[in-house]
Amino acid sequence: MGICSSSCCGGKSRDALYENVLAENEREAVADLLQYLENRAETDFFSGEPLRALSTLVYSDNIDLQRSASLTFAEITERDVRAVDRDTLGPILFLLENSDIEVQRAASAALGNLAVNTDNKVLIVQLGGLQPLIKQMMSPNVEVQCNAVGCITNLATHEENKAKIARSGALGPLTRLAKSKDMRVQRNATGALLNMTHSDENRQQLVNAGAIPVLVQLLSSSDVDVQYYCTTALSNIAVDANNRRKLAETEQRLVQYLVNLTESSSPKVQCQAALALRNLASDEKYQLEIVQAHGLGPLLRLLRSSYLPLILSAVACIRNISIHPQNESPIIEAGFLKPLVDLLGSTDNEEIQCHAISTLRNLAASSDRNKSLVLEAGAVQKCKQLVLEVPVTVQSEMTAAIAVLALSDELKTHLLELGVFDVLIPLTMSPSVEVQGNSAAALGNLSSKVGDYSIFVQNWMEPRDGIHGYLNRFLASGDATFQHIAIWTLLQLLESEDKKLIGLIGKSDGVVDMIKQIANRQMMESDNEAEDDDEGEVVNLAQRCLELLGQGGSKSHIEG
C-alpha cells in the first residue's frame, strides 16, 4: 500500500479551501485504510467504516487514490468472496468507468472475483455492470481485456444473466477476443461463449455474432482448455437442425477436426468431440461424413475405454451413425459387434445399454447377412440373459432388436432354439405398452414360415399362460395395433399346417369368439364407409382366420 501512503501528499493546491477540505478527508481515509489493512484478517471491508474509507478514495479526483482503492478491492476480493450489496458494488462499478488502465484492470479483477458468488452475479448485471465490461473488452490493454472477459464468463454461468448478456452486445467482442494472441484472454473468451450455448435463443444470437467460424478454427488450438470450450460449444450449437445446416454449408473441415480430437490426450476433450459428432450425426450427411473421415477407429477405441463418460459419448455417437443403411457394413467390419454386445452386460448404466442395443438393432436393419452377424456376436443370448432384469427402457430396445432379427427367415429356427419364447411371452404382460408391443411383434415375426411349429405347441400354455394367454390379452385389449399384431400372428399359426397347433387354436373358445367379434364389428358398421385401411386390414385378417378355422360361414349368418 505504498501508493496509498504517498498519495496523501498528492499534488493538490493548498490555496483553495475546498480542495484542502477534500485533501483532509482523503488523508483521514488513507490513514484509516492503512490501519484496517494492517489488521485485514479481522476487518470487514464490505461495510461500515472500512467501506466508507475505500469509497472516499474511489470518488476522489486523485488518480493515485483511485488506483489504491481499486488495488485494495482487487486484493481483498481475492481472499474474501461473499454476497455483497450495492454499497460495495457501486464503487467498484464506478471505478470500471475510469479512463486509467491500472484502475480498470484492478476494478475488473475485483468484480470478476465477486462474480464467483451466485447472488453477486445477478446484482452486478442488475446494477448495469455489463456495459462498462463490454467497453473494457475493447480496451487495447490485454490485462484489462482478460479481466473483463473473465468477469463476463463468471456472470454468464447464471441462467438469469444469459439472455441479458446475449442481448447486451457482448457476443461480438467476445467472438473477436476468442482469437486473441494472449492465451488467457482466449480461454476466458471461449469459456464465455460456451456459457452462452445453453438455450436456443442464445445459440442463435451467438451464430448471428459470427461465432461459428471462430469456434471451428480454434478446434485446432494447442491449448486443451480452448479445445474443450470450443468443442463443447459446437456440440451444443449442433443440437439445432438449422445450425447443423449452417455448419454443413460453411464448415467443411469440422468433422475432420472433431475426429482428430477424439484422439486427444485429454479425456474431457475426447468426450466432447464424440458428443459433438453424435449431435451432428442427427443428420444423414454427417452420418456418412464421419465414416468417410475415418471416425470409426477412434470411436471404437473410446468404446473400449474403461472411463464411463468416454464409453457413453462413443456409443451414443455410433448409435446415430448406425442409423444410415450405408454405414451398417462399415461399422460391423470395423469390429464394433462384440464390444457392443459386451457393453450390454458390463455396465448398469441404462443409457449405455440402450445405445448399445439400439445400435445392434440398426446394424441388423437392412440385410439378412448383417442380422446373422449380429446373432453370431451373441446379441440375442445376452438379451435373453438380461432382459427380464434390466430397466423398462432397455427392455424396449432389446425386444425391438429381437423383433428385427426375427424378420430373417434364415434365423427364425436359430432364435427359437435359443429359447427366446422364455422371455418374449412374459414380456407381453409388461406394464410398458412399448415392451408389450415389441415382444408381440417379435412373436409375430417368429410365427411366419418357420417350418417346424412344435415349439409353438410346447409353449401354447406356458410360460405365463403361453402364446394362448398372449393372444387372448391382445385380442381383448381394444387396442387396434395390438389386435392387428395378434390376429396376424394367429393367421401365421393357422397357415402353418401343423395339425396339433391348429387344433389347440380351434379349442380356444375365447380366442375364436374374439376373432368373430372383430370380424363382425366391421361388417355391422360397413354402411357408414368410414373405416380406414388399417381397420379394414384387421377385419380381413380376422375373416381369413375364421375361414381357416372352418367358421367362415358365420359371415352370412350375421348379415342375414
Curated annotation (Swiss-Prot):
Start-end of each ARM repeat: 39-76, 77-116, 118-157, 159-198, 200-239, 243-282, 284-323, 325-365, 409-448
Alphabetized UniProt keyword annotations: Lipoprotein, Membrane, Myristate, Palmitate, Repeat, Vacuole
Lipid-carrying residues in chain (N-myristoyl glycine): G2
Gene name linked to the record: VAC8
Compartments, as annotated in UniProt: Vacuole membrane
Gene3D superfamilies, A to Z: Leucine-rich Repeat Variant (1.25.10.10)
Listed name of the protein: Vacuolar protein 8
Protein family per UniProt: Belongs to the beta-catenin family.
BP-aspect Gene Ontology terms: establishment of organelle localization; nucleus-vacuole junction assembly; pexophagy; piecemeal microautophagy of the nucleus; protein localization to membrane raft; protein localization to phagophore assembly site; protein-containing complex localization; ribophagy
One GO cellular component term: membrane raft
Cross-referenced InterPro entries: ARM-like, ARM-type_fold, Armadillo, Vac8
Top-level taxon: Eukaryota
Role according to the record: Functions in both vacuole inheritance and protein targeting from the cytoplasm to vacuole.
Chief location of this protein within or outside the cell: membrane
Lipid tethering residues (S-palmitoyl cysteine): C4
